[in-house]
Amino acid sequence: ASLPSTENTPSGYDNVQNTARGFDWRNDQPASIVYAMPLDSGYIKKKVPFHDAVFALEAPFNGTPKELFKTENRYSRTNWGNDQVALVSEQLRSKQQYKVSLYNSKSNTISTLYEGNSTDMYNNPGNPVTEKNSFGEEVLAISKDGQTIMFNNTTGASAKGDLPYLAKFNIQTKSKEILWR
């Protein structure tokens, strides 16, 4: 592979090299690689409607990559569940902001689930609960009706101290219910 020199990578938070990055397997598919490409030439301060585009390339990896979605901030990662439920994380480290969206690859739609400040531990939902799928890969644990995912917050910061919790999150109503604390 031929990669550009990192000497010319723009400095500063949220700036990235102007090339593909964040290569990862799409855990809900048998053999598909996902990666991000900057749409702003790597400069976050560039005024564009979307800063990154995320692509997938299926085995045998010699076809044309398919664009899955675009992000308004810098793409961080995707927690895959199935072809209708995936959590897309994007962030602006310089402003300590994050956003998590619901991506449905079947209908090719993406919608914001929640946003927050990375230093606000009181409102941190925690990490999504996962389970192994038929490929032996970790994917989101989704309820049978496809409406609910689980979050595990091992810190559970609150005004009363750290109280870890397990919560269910309805992806349609965007409501959280703490099951155990």
Residue ranges, per PLM feature:
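Beta-propeller folds
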Residues: 1-181
